[in-house]
Amino acid sequence: MSEIVLSLEDVVAGYGRAAPVLRGLSVPVRAGEVVCLVGPNGAGKSTVLKVASGLLAPRSGRVLLAGRDVTGLSPQRLLGLGLAHVLQGHSVFREMTVAENVRLGGFTVRDQARLTARIEAVKELFPVVRERWNSMAGLLSGGQQKQVEFARALMLEPSVVLLDEPSMGLDPRNTQVVFEQIDLMRRTGVAVLLVEQNARRALEMADLGCVLDLGRVHISGPARELAADPRLGRLYLGGAPAT
């Protein structure tokens, strides 16, 4: 079994003085695996990503990255330690070229040879980046822009990538491409913590599924088994699985 590269341990977190959204949540993420968070609206899925990425400090509990306690560190510090975050929606800079967008992901790389090597690596992973390198990012389709975001996130060779609703607003064909690219990340050894509106499809390709309810992990287990469970389908996944 691969090592745990990201771990949220007994996390309590919320916003302002309101009641906590996360109430003692624990989630492990192993190297080269996709962990998918599912559950009803308000269960705390996106809050988990905010805590993991440093956007929201927990009230209690710990976040460990490669065994190191990184609770409360800024997103910039976490990026330098190997954790990247692809935000919900489209975060490309539309008035910049694909090349300029991708290079932003390597802004801390001072060694030109290493920077060139990373650019070639992401071009190999994401063909649209190579093909549209000098195009304005705003001219790309939604699915192509998402691939540019993935490429930018991988420029610093993170061990963990957080993905928040990566297929939001995409048609079925581009959604399929996004899932293929997530699988490609996994096969390169990157760990992925995923929140996805297309919950059943995400569980079918993930390794571990965690069903959140009322700020806790209600059920966890092999993701494909959860996707096929008719009880979970009715409660959380928009109906029973097709037979």
Predicted segments with their positions:
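Helix-to-loop junction immediately C-terminal to a conserved catalytic motif
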Residues: 53
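ABC-type ATPase nucleotide-binding domains, specifically the catalytic core motifs of the NBD
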Residues: 16-17, 98-117, 125-127, 221, ...
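Conserved catalytic motifs of ABC-family nucleotide-binding domains
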Residues: 157
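Conserved ABC transporter NBD signature motif
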Residues: 61-68, 81, 114-119, 221
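Conserved ABC ATPase signature
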Residues: 136-140
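The feature captures the beta-strand-to-loop junction immediately N-terminal to the Walker
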Residues: 38-40
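ABC ATPase C-loop
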Residues: 153-154
